Amino acid sequence: MVESRRAAAAASAYASRCGIAPATSQRSLATPPTISVPSGEGRCRCHVARGAGRDPRRRLRRRRWCGRCGYHSHLTGGEFDVNRLCQQRSRERSCQLVAVPADPRPKRQRITDVLTLALVGFLGGLITGISPCILPVLPVIFFSGAQSVDAAQVAKPEGAVAVRRKRALSATLRPYRVIGGLVLSFGMVTLLGSALLSVLHLPQDAIRWAALVALVAIGAGLIFPRFEQLLEKPFSRIPQKQIVTRSNGFGLGLALGVLYVPCAGPILAAIVVAGATATIGLGTVVLTATFALGAALPLLFFALAGQRIAERVGAFRRRQREIRIATGSVTILLAVALVFDLPAALQRAIPDYTASLQQQISTGTEIREQLNLGGIVNAQNAQLSNCSDGAAQLESCGTAPDLKGITGWLNTPGNKPIDLKSLRGKVVLIDFWAYSCINCQRAIPHVVGWYQAYKDSGLAVIGVHTPEYAFEKVPGNVAKGAANLGISYPIALDNNYATWTNYRNRYWPAEYLIDATGTVRHIKFGEGDYNVTETLVRQLLNDAKPGVKLPQPSSTTTPDLTPRAALTPETYFGVGKVVNYGGGGAYDEGSAVFDYPPSLAANSFALRGRWALDYQGATSDGNDAAIKLNYHAKDVYIVVGGTGTLTVVRDGKPATLPISGPPTTHQVVAGYRLASETLEVRPSKGLQVFSFTYG
């Protein structure tokens, strides 16, 4: 309340200087105080000068000030930042004074949040660095390390010893320079590439093509020494100490970083969305830097391995010329393969065995809030929270949000836009994807199969292409990528992330299933559970047209290449933390009665009876409360607190455990081997369950 008065006082003080009457005398913290001048009704009397510049009143604050009316752009008022927004329409002036709440978190909490982001980013990058998506660049990285062993190191010295040491140091540092260049260019291009190209009015794939040309030039320079001399000639006028030697490797790393396309995940999605929407803050920069660093460490290992092999194996030392030719050839081959998108076929063929690890480090509520993976809540999308990820039955999650800010369409008559309202009466599947996303490339064959099988039965599919990288904003690239994947259904180009944000999306890929009345009935983030999605599609088609004849399910003929986790991910019961709830009804805070669904998806759980849910866990609120769990593990542990008994039913055999005291871990299954099974847990009234973990 005190802070609100301070903000209002600060706003009123500035308003009185400009002769403006406050629009309201009091506002709550949720609704900031606003002072405005309608167009043409008055001028600001505190006008200082025209032309933008630094405020000469240094005692206030060194911030930009408005050259049209002299308003100071920022003024701190208690816990608020008072921002002045000035617009000029024709010859009339409209000024607005707005008090905006500042970050309410204490300094220690803000530091902790940044450190958490750094840890999450590093772990996410490290997991990405051991994923199949790095395979295309591994040969170049390996040979870049092997090539770092200069032939001069094995020749007899003819000059000064100091020269040999300097050359040896340069060769030793080459792997680090290659990886350093990769980290720098990957981070900069991911965050700033799209904005920079837009400012310069260049094609969105200009950076990619420039990197491909640079990669070919570097490869040719390694093969042909005379060509390398031509490349170095522009630097000949630079003082000798500053010339980049041919064993530097930093330029090679810069080119590789631009072309490096890691597997999509929640952390990379947060970075890409922040860069594309120009919402870059300290947290985004920290997340990007630590993600790039984590992803680079495994690559550095391969580069150092190549260097060590070259040092230890005599054949490498004696054949440095051949090593240079091999490195150049592999570099050029990689560039040619990237032009024709050949590495994607290899990446699709090898399942991403790290996907479940990516999900586990980014599913916590606090982490998801910091990554801003949930998008912006508005009147159109607020009810999407009623849908749980990958539920095995239909849910009701509000009217489907609009397809906003679409910059173009493909695969429609005349490339004209489609309005969702025009599709009422049909079942609609909205599929978020990106053509270079390996996860999407494994999922799209199923979407294509559904479209081909059910388009004559009333199914409409719209692929919303939201780019991960700047070159994916080029319509021609998207069209080519769609053709390679066999996509013939309409594609909406969401280059500005407007529809992505309006749907509060989190992942590539993501599916939103909409019934014939325009209501969202199912949401699935990521790969997998294709049989569940197709079953729900068929159910909605039957609801829309009772008696319609449907073909055989396509999921029986399309192989599921989704990587399977070795164990079921940790199961949380807290509202906001739950990610694998497969039961009926909304999983919201408060007391409610639940029932088991007819079928339960793998690696999910459902509730029965009355439960009281909060942001910590789920409390048994009746004598019939129970949990059904489908899991894949050898051992199962439950974290539970309170006083009572826990009855565990496995294979029809009940076993009772006494529970007493604060929350702690209890083992409920001790298996002999890894298996997929169903378990029922019946906690007595008053026990609070927090999570399941697996071993």
From Swiss-Prot:
GO terms for molecular function: antioxidant activity; oxidoreductase activity. This is Protein DipZ. It is a multi-pass membrane protein. Gene3D superfamilies: Galactose-binding domain-like, Glutaredoxin. Keywords: Cell membrane, Membrane, Transmembrane, Transmembrane helix. It comes from Mycobacterium tuberculosis (strain ATCC 25618 / H37Rv). The keyword Electron transport does not apply. The keyword Cell membrane applies. It is found in: Cell membrane. The chain crosses the membrane at residues 123-143, 179-199, 205-225, 254-274, 285-305, 325-345. One of its GO terms (cellular component) is plasma membrane. Residues 394-542 form the Thioredoxin domain. GO terms for biological process: cytochrome complex assembly.
